[in-house]
């Protein structure tokens, strides 16, 4: 085996989470705090990358500190109760790598509990280590 460790992102690499979990959560929260606002999935993807989600929230949408905290709690609750599907073929890729003696590392902004649950619920091989990229530490 040439590369023993396969380093995976989680959202939208291993599981289809933005379209099925994060964007619907965003729309549901907007309905509560900015009912006049309207975004498509494409808008949401684009603005996540430029200017970034926080700039969207604080700039374009003008969220207050209270609304930012509310959005984060709302999103966490939403994510806890919904499991995104793994992309077709990803299980086979990960299993083949593990069966050959390789390691799987996940680097993500997602919560550790969500990553572990998503792997378990999609019957994916358990990652050997999970790094939360925003904290720059492993959990």
Q: Locations of the language-model features?
A:
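Structural beta-sheet core signal
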Residues: 105-106
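Surface-exposed amphipathic alpha-helices with a cationic face
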Residues: 91-99
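N-terminal helical cap/lid subdomain that shapes the substrate entry/recognition surface
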Residues: 2-88, 100, 113-116
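Alpha-helical structural signal in soluble globular domains
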Residues: 28-29, 96, 121-122
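Short, well-ordered coil/turn elements that cap or connect secondary structure elements
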Residues: 99-101, 124-125
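Core-facing hydrophobic residues within beta-strands of well-ordered domains
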Residues: 3, 94, 126-127
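Surface-exposed loop/turn and secondary-structure junction residues enriched for glycine/proline
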Residues: 47-48, 87-90, 127, 133-134
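Substrate-recognition "cap/lid" segment bordering the active-site pocket of phosphatases
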Residues: 111-138
């Amino acid at each position: 085996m040439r590369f023993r460790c396969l380093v995976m992102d989680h959202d939208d690499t291993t599981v289809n989470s933005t379209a099925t979990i994060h964007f619907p959560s965003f729309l549901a929260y907007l309905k509560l705090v900015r009912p006049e606002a309207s975004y498509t999935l494409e808008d949401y993807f684009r603005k996540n990358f430029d200017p970034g989600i926080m700039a969207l929230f604080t700039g374009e949408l003008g969220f207050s500190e209270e609304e930012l905290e509310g959005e984060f709690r709302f999103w966490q609750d939403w994510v806890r109760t919904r499991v995104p599907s793994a992309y077709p073929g990803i299980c086979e890729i990960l299993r083949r790598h593990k069966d050959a003696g390789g390691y799987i590392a996940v680097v993500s902004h997602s919560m550790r509990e969500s990553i572990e649950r998503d792997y378990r619920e999609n019957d994916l091989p358990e990652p050997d280590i999970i790094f939360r990229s925003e904290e720059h530490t492993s959990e």
